Amino acid sequence: MKPLVLGAALAGVLAQASSDRPPTRNVGTMSDLMVKIIYPASDALFYIESRTPKTDAEWTVLEGQALMVAESANLLMLPGRARDQKQWMADAKLMLDAGADAVAAAKKKDVEAIVALSDRLMESCTTCHKNYRPNYGKPPLD
């Protein structure tokens, strides 16, 4: 009986803690997030071989770009942005994991590791776009 009481008390504390959190508010549109944050940040990772950082300052910028990719995945999972709790969240989690790994690789200045995670990052983009972006991959109509 004690574990049940403890569990109920813990659930009450957690519910109170989440209700004390200030509400989030989406400021930009999905297009704003993609075009102004995610695309430029992910491009820095996708094109690492042709735009390899040479200085500590450039590596710091790349680490920031990788961090933007990872944290943008968290933004995509917020209420009001997440389209569903299954596929959308799975795609965002792929992006989060690839971005987090890119942050770790950038801290080590490991170009090869960033190149190696490109496929994972691209998979998160393409599967999400196929499912949620109308006409993705289709030729434009004349």
Residue spans for each PLM region:
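Positively charged n-region of N-terminal signal peptides that target proteins for export
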Residues: M1-P3
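Hydrophobic h-region of N-terminal signal peptides that target proteins for export
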Residues: V5-A17
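Sequence context surrounding c-type heme c attachment/ligation sites in exported
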Residues: S18-D142
